[in-house]
Amino acid sequence: MNVSVVILAAGAGTRMKSHIPKVLHKICGKEMLFYSIDEALKISDDVHIVLFHQENVIKERLLCAYKQAYADGALHFHLQDHAHYPGTGGALMQGQNAGANAKKPFCYQYDEILILNGDMPLVCSQTLKSLCQNKAQIVMSVLHLQNPDGYGRVVMESGVVQRIIEQKDAKESELLIKDVNAGVYKIHKSILDLYLPQVGNANNQQEFYLTDVVFYAKENGIEIAALEVKEEEFMGVNSKIQLACAQEIMLQRLREKAMEQGVIMNLPHTIYLESNVTFSGECIIEQGVQILGDSHISDSHIKAHSVIEQSIIESSDVGPLAHIRPKSHIKNTHIGNFVETKSSTLRGVKVGHLSYLGDCEIDEGSNIGAGVITCNYDGKAKHKTTIGKSVFVGSDVQLIAPLNIESNVLIGAGSTITKDIEYGDLALSRVAQQNIKDGFFKFFSDKNEEKKEQ
């Protein structure tokens, strides 16, 4: 679309009570601001982010995540002159460094300007598109709420916006109004050019309000179109409570999307998914499962209370109570309860229970017994274990990396393996067992004598 998008992300977010910038708090594994940017980039190739508080931290994160969009000129950054021009209107002004143009808007590629907030992670591009398709010179989003506390009130007559009043400046009678400003606008560039420089800060907060642009336009006979929107989409996140509420809504969206793609979910409200998780084929996800990061699950069964982090699971069953940690690739494999993997590739393997497999590669047909551990860390560095095809590793075996175990190898239970094993070998590493005649009676007889002496 031929529209420029401005995302306001300059606020301090003090109600979050956190050293982390408000817009970088995560919802389903993704920064709040990233949701707004992603939806904006779906409809525009000219997106502007206005920053101030902790702007270096936010900008660094954005440049890392949106390197290509920035290189292509689709993403731009502006630093608000907060000292001289605070507020939502001030966020659109060039600031004191621009001299005579201090209160003029920034330069945009298109005539239609869509303005939204960086703390609205639930807004959808389709709704933004609806705002932009309205031909009015000013279109604003309006919510009808039973409890409008915290929002600016919208005074309307016959469906037409008359003015907007910030809550802190509202009279008692105006606080009863249920129509509120959802905070997203589409404004023609000519309106901003004309009325933004007229905005002052003679209000209780001594801030420059974007809503005053709407007021001046209305005073000069320009009709303000209102688009009623859903509260769920336009919910602002200003506190940890609102953050949790937004995450619940996002989680439900992610679950429904997965189920629409054919995923079976047992007790879906107990399942946690992050935003970059993908599925393909027929999958079953049981209750209490967490799937995090850029994980991909294909034709697999993830059993109850398992955790999958940043990994690929293909044609496998995992769990219950398994932990697949980052950089694991599990294919055609059975992983049972209390098995943990990390940075490992398993192809056609059986790992029944109670094992840790880190920094290893195991080939098809191999069986890993209970209690097997790859000892991959020597206190200074990680080392790799490689296990070939059709290897049988007995229970309670410690594999001291670096280690190469070739195919068709048998390792006896209880062994500590420190050397490579060649094709077809049997490896044993145990202290010889001794059975001491009547040792039980002698041991406890000595204990009883000690008690008598005391």
Curated annotation (Swiss-Prot):
Q: Can you tell me which residues bind UDP-N-acetyl-alpha-D-glucosamine?
A: 8-11, 22, 87-88, 152, 166, 181, 238, 325, 342, 356, 367
Q: Which UniProt keywords apply?
A: Acyltransferase, Cell shape, Cell wall biogenesis/degradation, Cytoplasm, Magnesium, Metal-binding, Multifunctional enzyme, Nucleotidyltransferase, Peptidoglycan synthesis, Repeat, Transferase
Subunit structure comment from the entry: Homotrimer.
Q: What lineage, starting at the top, does this entry show?
A: Bacteria, Pseudomonadati, Campylobacterota, Epsilonproteobacteria, Campylobacterales
The record's catalysed reaction(s) read:
alpha-D-glucosamine 1-phosphate + acetyl-CoA = N-acetyl-alpha-D-glucosamine 1-phosphate + CoA + H(+); N-acetyl-alpha-D-glucosamine 1-phosphate + UTP + H(+) = UDP-N-acetyl-alpha-D-glucosamine + diphosphate
**What CDD domains does UniProt report for this protein, alphabetically?**
GT2_GlmU_N_bac, LbH_GlmU_C
The protein's name: Bifunctional protein GlmU
User: What InterPro entries does this protein's entry cite?
Assistant: Bifunctional_GlmU, GlmU-like, GlmU_C_LbH, Hexapep_transf_CS, MobA-like_NTP_Trfase, Nucleotide-diphossugar_trans, Trimer_LpxA-like_sf
Please give the residue ranges the record annotates as the region Linker. 241-261
Q: Which GO molecular-function terms appear in the entry?
A: glucosamine-1-phosphate N-acetyltransferase activity; magnesium ion binding; UDP-N-acetylglucosamine diphosphorylase activity
Which superkingdom is the protein from?
Answer: Bacteria
- Which gene is this protein's source? glmU
Q: Which residues bind acetyl-CoA?
A: A370, N376, Y377, S395, A413, R430
Q: Does the keyword DNA damage apply?
A: no
The record lists Mg(2+) as bound by: D119, N238
UniProt pathway: Nucleotide-sugar biosynthesis; UDP-N-acetyl-alpha-D-glucosamine biosynthesis; N-acetyl-alpha-D-glucosamine 1-phosphate from alpha-D-glucosamine 6-phosphate (route II): step 2/2; Nucleotide-sugar biosynthesis; UDP-N-acetyl-alpha-D-glucosamine biosynthesis; UDP-N-acetyl-alpha-D-glucosamine from N-acetyl-alpha-D-glucosamine 1-phosphate: step 1/1; Bacterial outer membrane biogenesis; LPS lipid A biosynthesis
